[in-house]
């Protein structure tokens, strides 16, 4: 199944990579980036495996990768849309629609 990254999700993953690079290493940043991308590809093929988070936004699902949560929904044309990738300590309900 196909997936689409929102502009915010693209920015999120770039910020995650940069933060990891600046605080750990290039190798760790690349490893974490690839881990997140692997999970996105898994979600695209197994959308129902994500936990329903209707309490945040109706129709959204979430999947955890280490310290981050990937939020997604399925579009009308059956494409999985990755909405945001947020750190677990963030205020999800307010940050999801920023």
Question: What are the residue ranges of the model-derived segments?
Answer:
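Arg/Lys-rich, positively charged N-terminal/basic patches that mediate binding to nucleic acids
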Residues: 1-33
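Short proline/glycine- and basic residue-enriched helix-capping loop/turn segments at helix->loop/beta transitions
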Residues: 44-45
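Enriched for short, Lys/Arg-rich terminal
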Residues: 68, 73-98
């Amino acid at each position: 199944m196909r997936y689409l990254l929102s502009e915010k999700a693209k920015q999120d993953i770039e910020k995650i990579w940069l933060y990891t690079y600046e605080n750990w290493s290039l190798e760790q940043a690349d490893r974490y980036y690839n881990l997140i991308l692997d999970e996105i590809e898994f979600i695209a093929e197994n959308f129902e495996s994500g936990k329903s988070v209707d309490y945040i936004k109706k129709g959204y699902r979430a999947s955890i990768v280490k310290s981050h949560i990937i939020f997604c929904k399925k579009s009308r044309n059956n494409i999985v849309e990755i909405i945001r990738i947020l750190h677990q300590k963030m205020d999800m309900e307010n940050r999801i629609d920023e």
